């Protein structure tokens, strides 16, 4: 059964456009409360990033959950992985995150976590969708949910992050620049690194509700590159708006993406006898990651794009490390979801143990040229991925790459985009193929 509202990472869209409206969020809170209450007493944590619309949707969800008889614990602005962690430690039935991750402020969305701090199973999301189609009812007044606020949430999460590295760890002498994207990490991330001894310069940590991800963070890394170079820092760390993605910049200003961070973490775990199994990437992971891991005899498998699918593959195989090149990195020995701060700490720990700079560590992975072009499609009824001309062109490019590259066409799970990716050994050839395919996809979408 297909899902009506839930995409690969919850529900997301433009604020004020259905379903990202206060009335829908009220009903969603009620439906979620009813679904979680089927197991008896229900307690739900609610957190958000720094978007101005988060306050509006927080109130709507709170009312809906209470109407269903669910108790609500408000966290305020907190990173998405912090909400997963706190949901677990408070033994709540579920956690709800109000965020649109790396999107601009005029988007927002909802993510759910189970009581174990993992993304909800598909069957629970389908149950919530079925309840959304039913009339909303209110429990009798004596059974209405109560609302409280967790005032020490940030401190709890900071201590948890620090516990992911050995207690004797000190990053004294390490000069960092940290870009918080005016988002949910703006308070906790600087504290974590400073309390571990690093010299931290903070960028973009003055959220006003409208500036989240605006020209900053992991999707706009230019200002971090400049700050690292000007300040002669050892490296820079860029988070996205909700703190589940991380990219880095080495001391030369070069960007270090999720594939490279994943390799550094996996190699460190292997060298210390702590790598359980192999590594999970996605269909978008660079071929160079697969080859570099193969050189170390580390198994590598590809999941569908989306950290929920990476996590599912890790759990099924009982492996520890996986992620996406966009910067979602999951370390199952510490977390139940992608956690940007935890991932950054594991990279810093790996560098410290090897006595390497970030620039040196990334040299062990030789990335293949990869060109990704996003093609926006509107109300066209044509499925570009099923169009005969697109299929034929894709097959021809695959044949031309002669087993030394890949072609991937897929729809985004969160935006009206077709992602055209071509990967191979010759960058000019790869770019030409990607541009030709993207042009064709755009034409059939009209």
Swiss-Prot record:
Cofactor requirement: Mg(2+)
Metal-binding in keyword set: yes
Leading EC class: isomerase
EC number: 5.4.2.10
GO-annotated molecular function: magnesium ion binding; phosphoglucosamine mutase activity; phosphomannomutase activity
Residues the record marks as active site: 101
GO cellular component, one term: cytosol
Modifications the protein undergoes after translation, according to the UniProt entry: Activated by phosphorylation.
Note on cofactor: Binds 1 Mg(2+) ion per subunit.
A Pfam family annotated for this UniProt entry: PGM_PMM_III
CDD domains reported in the protein's UniProt record: GlmM (cd05802)
Modified residues (Phosphoserine): 101
UniProt cross-references to Gene3D superfamilies, sorted A to Z: Alpha-D-Glucose-1,6-Bisphosphate, subunit A, domain 3, Alpha-D-phosphohexomutase, C-terminal domain
Described purpose of this protein according to its UniProt entry: Catalyzes the conversion of glucosamine-6-phosphate to glucosamine-1-phosphate.
HAMAP family documented for this protein: GlmM_B (MF_01554_B)
Protein name, per record: Phosphoglucosamine mutase
The species this protein was found in: Pseudomonas putida (strain ATCC 47054 / DSM 6125 / CFBP 8728 / NCIMB 11950 / KT2440)
